[in-house]
Amino acid sequence: MSITFGELVGNFILVTGSVIVLLLLIKKFAWGAIESILQTRSQQISRDIDQAEQSRLSAQQLEAKSQANLDASRSQASKIISDAKEIGQLQGDKLVAEATDEAKRLKEKALTDIEQSKSDAISAVKTEMSDLTVLLAKKIMGANLDKTAQSQLIDSYLDDLGEA
């Protein structure tokens, strides 16, 4: 089966005419609806893009605000920690100073007590010595002793001093 040139041209004209008629019918009856659908879809896509952009900007602002809050929180935490360290150091220094002052006070009191005890002991020894001296003088005055008796009395006195 072979197709002639005339048949080929006839088919071409028929198909071309059919396509043109079809396009005219589509333009008259369906093109408005198709164009409306395409316009609506285009507007929807445009709104979606705008909303996505707004969401992105909002997310960026929220991220920036969150980062600022996080930085502020970190700064506050660092300040709280440094303040706590400083307060701890000050309290430690205060306790050390108080302990040092207390130790000095106790040392001074102990030295004062030692001096008082020493003074009391010296006073007691002096009183004892004076009492013994008076006693010895009474014994010497009460008896006219010769040199050996005096020597024995002095030795006895010295022995009494050694025991006291």
Curated annotation (Swiss-Prot):
Transmembrane residue ranges: 6-26
Keyword Protein biosynthesis applies:
no
Q: Which PANTHER family match?
A: ATP SYNTHASE SUBUNIT B (PTHR33445:SF1), ATP SYNTHASE SUBUNIT B', CHLOROPLASTIC (PTHR33445)
Q: Which UniProt keywords apply?
A: ATP synthesis, Cell membrane, CF(0), Hydrogen ion transport, Ion transport, Membrane, Transmembrane, Transmembrane helix, Transport
Lineage, top-rank taxon, reads Bacteria
Principal location class: membrane
| Record-linked InterPro entries | ATP_synth_B-like_membr_sf, ATP_synth_b/b'su_bac/chlpt, ATP_synth_F0_bsu_bac, ATP_synthase_B_chain
Q: Name one GO molecular function term.
A: proton-transporting ATP synthase activity, rotational mechanism
In the bilayer, the protein is annotated as: Single-pass membrane protein
Give the UniProt subcellular location, in the record's own words. Cell membrane
Q: Name one GO cellular component term.
A: plasma membrane
Give the record's family classification: Belongs to the ATPase B chain family.
**Function, please?**
F(1)F(0) ATP synthase produces ATP from ADP in the presence of a proton or sodium gradient. F-type ATPases consist of two structural domains, F(1) containing the extramembraneous catalytic core and F(0) containing the membrane proton channel, linked together by a central stalk and a peripheral stalk. During catalysis, ATP synthesis in the catalytic domain of F(1) is coupled via a rotary mechanism of the central stalk subunits to proton translocation. Component of the F(0) channel, it forms part of the peripheral stalk, linking F(1) to F(0).
- Subunit text: F-type ATPases have 2 components, F(1) - the catalytic core - and F(0) - the membrane proton channel. F(1) has five subunits: alpha(3), beta(3), gamma(1), delta(1), epsilon(1). F(0) has three main subunits: a(1), b(2) and c(10-14). The alpha and beta chains form an alternating ring which encloses part of the gamma chain. F(1) is attached to F(0) by a central stalk formed by the gamma and epsilon chains, while a peripheral stalk is formed by the delta and b chains.
Keyword Ion transport among UniProt keywords: yes
Please report the name of this protein according to its UniProt entry: ATP synthase subunit b
